[in-house]
Amino acid sequence: MMGENRARVVALVVAVVVVVVGVAGNVAAAQAAVTVADLQRVAGSLQMYVDALPQMAKIRGYGFQRGQAVPINLTIGMYQKTWKFHRDLPATPVFVYGQCPDSATFPGPTIMARHDVPLFVRWENHLPASHILPWDPTVPTAIPKNGGVPTVVHLHGSAHPPQSDGSAFAWFTAGFAEKGPAWTQATYRYPNVQPPGNLWYHDHALGLTRANLLAGLLGAYVIEKPEVDTPMDLPCDDDDLHLVIADRSFNVDGSLYMNSTGVAPNIHPQWAPEYFGEAITVNGKAWPFLVVHRRRYRLRILNASNARYFNVSLSNGLPIHVVGSDASYLSAPVTVSNLLLSPAEIFDVVVDFSQSPTAEIELLNSAPYPFPTGAAPGPLNGKVMKFIVQPNGPLDPPDNSTVPDHEVPYASVTALPPTTMTRYIVMYEYLTPTGQSTHLYINGLRLEDPVTETPKSGTTELWQVINLTGDNHPLHIHLGMFQAVKMQQLVNLQAFTDCMTAVNDAVKCNVDQHAVGPVVPVPDHEKTWKNVIKVPPGFVTSVVIAFKLVDTNQTYPFDTTAEPGYVYHCHILDHEDNAMIRPLKLLA
């Protein structure tokens, strides 16, 4: 992403002189310089496939009364503890979610919610006075006056009231001692009114999202709807597994590594445009193994990395049957040989290990980093985990699961009422004269600037997302579900970029005369209602967004117009924190 490739497509070059001495509250700022070679030596010293893949504890997000599912209240805390990422690595200090310190895990417990049964969660901050990782006060950041680690929880992919969205400004420190300007309540309400699917929860504090997630504040969340799920006969129980993938680098003492010096330290002393770890963890273990039998397994794969894309495939060519993406099923399964996941993206897949020609299968990664034009993965970050296939035992139950020939026929984008508004969403990156990234904006605006995206609740909009940077960006829009319908390359890109740099207006810069290049088809396994879409560089990506429930075409059963509103942003966390994020305010 850096250097000439990036320089060709940036929207503006800036030279900013900022003098910052130290990094406030940064306990790691004084660390000796650590090189990539140092990190690779630590990661390379860890033998692959010696730790079994764990499954995180499941918390049922509903109760039962007279045989009916009913709402409940949960309390989930954030704690500092140590976690063993590998047999041969010292225990690592982490921040993690759990119902108590002893049960807190990396990633956090999986919350199993029931469709149309509200869940109330009190999120409590029990973190220490200072962070375990470096952070940068020169990007827009929640900085409490009296110390502490600001946190706030966002349920990614959920339809919920604004007060429960986890606004970046709704942060709070331990014991609610200090609270951000948008903080409203300690208990969040999740109505679970949307279609069944896979979500995840994670930290969303202003300027600290990248550090807080890197430290471990993330976990899976599932909305089940038995009348939809059960008839499909997908693999279930022990054959239904989560794979939460996250790259991490480790210091020699086992602690998590995050850079202490930025790429342009005279501007941002610590911030860097992407974090790439040398070790690949799955469910909190570095390069684990999983023993499977010759039967079908359902794998809910979440890329919880800060910036790394994963293009996963099975080493023996076994096909991957995609049945869902993010928080919805597909209308019918799609079989692929490889699967590209952006950060924050989820794919729900079935793998039939009864068809495996080998007893061992590696899950491989071939995605360049940064994506799409960076370096190819090496022998460490090119491998994810191993499956060890064993024969079925005499006591194993028969495999009655299927890959269904059809799933959930949600309304297609063409069947929805016409879009009520077309908006141009432009992604910019700003560089120093020597080509170092300083910050990223959407439409040339900051999060703190006045809101410009004000859709009406219950409507459908078309967003033309223009990417003038060198990176692919995972776009996440809170509340709404959406899908890319067209990706068209821009021609005469530099001329268009120069015009946009000058006037910041796609219509005045005649975008229609530039958006005439080749059309790249949206992959079939992404043609569903999603929570993250990939926006390729140098393209206009047409995105249809439904600000309503896509399975019923009904408006939300809560007030979407309340404060503090919602946001949309790039889900490369280093970009989101500086500051590729904008407010989204729904109107009645």
Curated annotation (Swiss-Prot):
Highly expressed in roots and basal stems. Expressed in leaf sheaths. One of its GO terms (cellular component) is endoplasmic reticulum membrane. It is an enzyme of class 1 (oxidoreductase). Its EC number is 1.-.-.-. It is a peripheral membrane protein. SUPFAM superfamilies: Cupredoxins (SSF49503). Residues 288-357 form the Plastocyanin-like domain. Residues 1-32 form the signal peptide. It comes from the Eukaryota. Cu cation 1 binds at H154, H476. Belongs to the multicopper oxidase family. Cu cation 2 binds at H156, H202, H571. Glycans are attached at N73, N259, N303, N311, N400, N467, N553. Binds 4 Cu cations per monomer. The Cu cations are bound as 3 distinct Cu centers known as type 1 or blue, type 2 or normal, and type 3 or coupled binuclear. Induction: Induced by phosphate or potassium deficiency. It is found in: Endoplasmic reticulum membrane. Cu cation 4 binds at H473, C570, H575, M580. It comes from Oryza sativa subsp. japonica. Multicopper oxidase that may play a role in the maintenance of inorganic phosphate homeostasis. Keywords: Copper, Endoplasmic reticulum, Glycoprotein, Membrane, Metal-binding, Oxidoreductase, Signal. InterPro entries: Cu-oxidase-like_N, Cu-oxidase_2nd, Cu-oxidase_C, Cu_oxidase_Cu_BS, Cupredoxin, LPR1/LPR2. This is Multicopper oxidase LPR1 homolog 4.
